Amino acid sequence: MDNARMNSFLDYSIINGETGTCSSRSYHADQGITTYQSCAVSNNNCNADDRYIVSRSVQIGAPPPHHHHHQSNYTHPNNLGISYSAHPNCGAGYPAQSFNTGYSHHYSLNQETDGNGGYPQCAPAVYPGNIASAISPHHHSYGGMVGSGQYPHHPYGQEQQGLALAAGCHSLSPVHGSHQEACCSPSAETPPPAQTFDWMKVKRNPPKTGKAGEYGFAGQPNTVRTNFTTKQLTELEKEFHFNKYLTRARRVEIAAALQLNETQVKIWFQNRRMKQKKREKEGLTSASPATPGSEANTEDTSDKCNSTSSTPSPSSSTSETINTSG
């Protein structure tokens, strides 16, 4: 095969959609950039989805905006077999068509530009497109959607197809791909359920063990009972005789005079009132009970009367002196 034949490429397009015949045209590659026109087979009796197209994948280098010199090396490793099977809804007059193509291109472009240097070679990519869409000259490989048919067997193997699909879907940089996998992997994992330990539980205070009195708890179980002196009890009894209920100012005054605190004076008056009510219920006291203070007052008044009666009056003493003189 001569160089002129190697530097040319084949363009297959179906001319007649009814008979399914294909015609091939050869073009001479001047710039070294190969373009492929998509071809489709559509029968009048078939559905709208019956479209057949060949997906190709090649290895390209990014073309610069200005081209000065291109060196293209084309190799034809083997022929790519493409077979089209007739749709079951089609008539019997359209048999299966098959033809062989010889442009499974694997080439490299060495380009010289006016810029800082050459462009790195990109990974193989597959560009999906429609059947009648215009393909840019920069897109060296493309693939179409296949409705119902057979995919052609690529000579590069399944591994290269997987790499091409992965490169087409994701970014061409492998660093970006690994970073994306690292970012997506933690979100896929579900966090384990939180485990509750004994030390995390709330510890509540135990109930009070003190004896409940008649009117609730008398205080903390370790509280020492107050022992009042005779003088303190006497002053408290005197105050209770005049006022059964104390104001806060009077309570503070009595506590300061008896060297007690307000709580002790308050509790004593509460207990004294309850004791008085209990005595009234039992009938030990009359309706107008005599308090020790009143009894002391009556005794004082009686003593005063006796003392005044025992002492002689001035009138009697004068009369006695007159009788003695007469």
Curated annotation (Swiss-Prot):
Q: Name one Pfam family in it.
A: Homeodomain
Major localization listed first in the record, in broad terms: nucleus
Name any GO cellular component annotation: nucleus
Query: Which InterPro entries does the annotation name?
Result: HD, HD_metazoa, Homeobox_CS, Homeodomain-like_sf, HXA1/B1/D1
- Which intervals of this chain are the motif Antp-type hexapeptide? 196-201
DNA-binding region extent: 221-280
Polar residues composition-biased segments: 285-296
> Which Gene Ontology MF annotations are present?
DNA-binding transcription factor activity, RNA polymerase II-specific; RNA polymerase II cis-regulatory region sequence-specific DNA binding
SMART domains the UniProt entry points to: HOX
Sorted keywords for this record are: Developmental protein, DNA-binding, Homeobox, Nucleus, Transcription, Transcription regulation
Point to the regions of Low complexity compositional bias: 306-326
Q: Which compartments does it reside in? A: Nucleus
Q: Does the entry feature the keyword Transcription, yes or no?
A: yes
Region annotation (Disordered) ranges: 273-326
The family assignment reads: Belongs to the Antp homeobox family. Labial subfamily.
Purpose of the protein: Sequence-specific transcription factor. Part of a developmental regulatory system that provides cells with specific positional identities on the anterior-posterior axis. Acts on the anterior body structures. Seems to act in the maintenance and/or generation of hindbrain segments.
Q: Kindly provide the name given to this protein in its UniProt entry.
A: Homeobox protein Hox-A1
Q: Which organism is it from?
A: Heterodontus francisci (Horn shark)
The gene name reads: HOXA1
